[in-house]
Amino acid sequence: MARVVPGFTFLFFGFLGLISNIPAEAAIKNYQFDIQVKNVSRLCHAKPIVTVNGRFPGPTIYVREGDRVRINVTNHAQYNMSIHWHGLKQYRNGWADGPAYITQCPIQTGNSYTYDFNVTGQRGTLWWHAHILWLRATVHGAFVIMPKPGTPFPFPQPHQEFELLLGEWWHADVEEVVKQGTNTGLPPNMSDAHTINGKPGPLFPCSEKHTFAIEVESGKTYLLRIINAALNDELFFAIAGHNMTVVEVDAVYTKPFSTQAILIAPGQTTNVLVQANQVPGRYFMAARPYMDAPLSIDNKTAAGILQYKGIPNTFLPTLPQLPAPNDTEFALSYNKKLRSLNTPRYPANVPLKVDRNLFYTVGFGKNSCPTCLNGTKLLASLNNISFVMPQVALLQAHYFNVKGVYRVDFPDRPPIPFNYTGAPLTANLGTAIGTRISKIAFNSTVELVLQDTNLLTVESHPFHLHGYNFFVVGTGIGNFDPVKDPAKYNLVDPVERNTVGVPTGGWTAIRFRADNPGVWFLHCHLELHTSWGLKTAFVVEDGPGADQSVLPPPKDLLPC
């Protein structure tokens, strides 16, 4: 999880075995991922979990901008598997994107599939994770893209780097927890702990040896690559006694700013610089949920340790002052500070003219379910449509013109306007269901406004768009006003990312240019909401040029 810069070292699991560093030139990077079940002990209890190469979290992928990456995944577990390379744009190459039944059929037990893609025009911290069922609870890892040789960071060079993956842990088998929730029609049980690099930390029982620690030297600067791999929780993260300087989110450089804590939603990444400038000692790094919706409070705090060199382990650490779990003011203020670097080398190419305006409401609902506990089951929807997963991958159906798999009639707006963020609505909560997606013209510019609603309850939702980055041009609390709110947009240096939070009882506006043909998933990155149907997809048409259409599928394309 750590590297020294320059001359960094790392673990590289490839076809060629253990390699010690990244070659300076662009290269082909080969990895072998074996999906294996392994017994792991946490919180005084052992259980079998699904892993990559027997590791939890899984191995970090290290590449340089411009490299070609080939990752062969062999499934030895009892579950079907697919791996998503979260934030990789996969230009024209949705075959390597990974979400099951969207761009590929899953890898069945005993089978293999090779993800073969180029890392073009991207550098920074991304990650990979399972994209089927809830298996990403334990099947995930970092994906670090170093700049091209000779290209420095646009911030002070750190002495050393560490990846921190924030996650969740359940005592029970996660898939059994989900199955129980599905059978009752109610939310499944919350996780029993949060983790830092798979370890809950000493605030949990039987966790003294399950505590992640990093060692620092006084006067030196460190880069933390922080990834929220949790399934269902936005998280605050802070280090006792130390400020952090945010320099990148979702593998895009930002204008640096100092903060005592960060807010990071599932799917997002944040790079921060930390100066070891405090009295030498041991300091807790801590993460706990941000939950401002009127729901059950999850107040479990994961802790790791930042330890100065030479300080004994008997030295008692101090805890950081994290924002309160419902500190919406901090959350809104923090997100407003995120701005693109917008320099000649790293411009913010914000679409100023919009060809297609989309307005999607985000909400919950209830449909009839005679076998469920209360005769109903909870659902989630966009524009009152709960997405139904197909039995054939959407990209295959699109490419091979297979009829009857999906409909391209997803509405640009909700069927009935209402007071989206007024008093909670508890009647007429039925939702339509279907595999309905939206067709987007190649190279058109799109503005999408995501509006939270009061259907059952308001709640924050982190949305991830596959195949693209987008600019977050506006956000606000209450109902989006299409006349007044666009005048307040930031069209100069808005933050660019691949996953954005829709605030509780509010809205977020994003813009992107649809220049990547294929079928691209759009979904809430809270796994619970995704499983309830809070998802859809864009099918972006081919362009007129020879290099503007979906690439042919790989020879090992999997059947469903």
Q: What does each of the following model-derived ranges do?
A:
Residues 3-23:
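Cleavable N-terminal signal peptides of Sec/SRP-targeted secreted and luminal proteins
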Residues 24-28:
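Boundary at the C-terminal end of the N-terminal hydrophobic targeting segment
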Residues 29-155, 233-262, 282-298, 369-513, ...:
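Histidine- and aromatic-enriched segments that form or immediately flank copper-ligand environments
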Residues 148-162, 310-325, 544-553:
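Low-complexity, Pro/Ser/Thr- and charge-rich linker/hinge segments at domain boundaries
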Residues 158-231, 319, 334-338, 356, ...:
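Acidic-aromatic/histidine active-site loop/patch
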Residues 240-250, 254-257, 261-313, 318-321, ...:
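Conserved small-residue hotspots that stabilize compact domain segments
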Residues 317-358, 391-392, 397-405, 409, ...:
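Intrinsic disorder/low-complexity detector
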